[in-house]
Amino acid sequence: MKSFTLLLSTVTLAAVIGAILTTPALAGPREDIIAGFTAQGAGPADLANGKRMYETTYGTGKPDTPKCTTCHGATPQEGGQTRTSKAIEPMAVSRTPARFTDKAKVDKWFLRNCSSVIGRECTAQEKVDFISYLVSQ
């Protein structure tokens, strides 16, 4: 009987913890930002597309910024620098935990960098893919 009670207590505790961790009210600002892009029509994240976006040489934006890695590190874990030699923290969320948590900054930098690198504004789907890839790094 003791083992059954212990098992029942463990299962109940696991269920409570699971419910707490998946409660939308506990979602963080990054998840809220992704939810906003989902509301604009983005589907599930495609990490491979996010990686492809980070590494692709586009040639459709400004000539001096043909790809993300022109200013950001060759890998998301590396820092980079602007064309004026100002340091840029790594894009990987594992290295820069506050990355993609401020909606105003996310909107500003996607608008500026997508226009500069790709030559157009990124779609909601591209933003979800890009953010999700960098969260995974």
Give, region by region, the residue ranges found by the protein language model.
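C-terminal capping alpha-helices of c-type cytochrome domains
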Residues: 107-137
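Short cysteine/histidine-rich zinc-coordinating motifs and their immediately flanking basic loops
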Residues: 80-87
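Positively charged n-region of N-terminal signal peptides that target proteins for export
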Residues: 1-6
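Sec/Tat signal peptide C-region and signal peptidase I cleavage site
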Residues: 21-27
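Electrostatic cytochrome c docking/interface patches
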Residues: 28-62
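Short microdomains enriched in Cys/His and/or Lys/Arg
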Residues: 89-104
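The canonical Cys-X-X-Cys-His
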Residues: 65-75, 130
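Bacterial N-terminal signal peptides
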Residues: 9-20
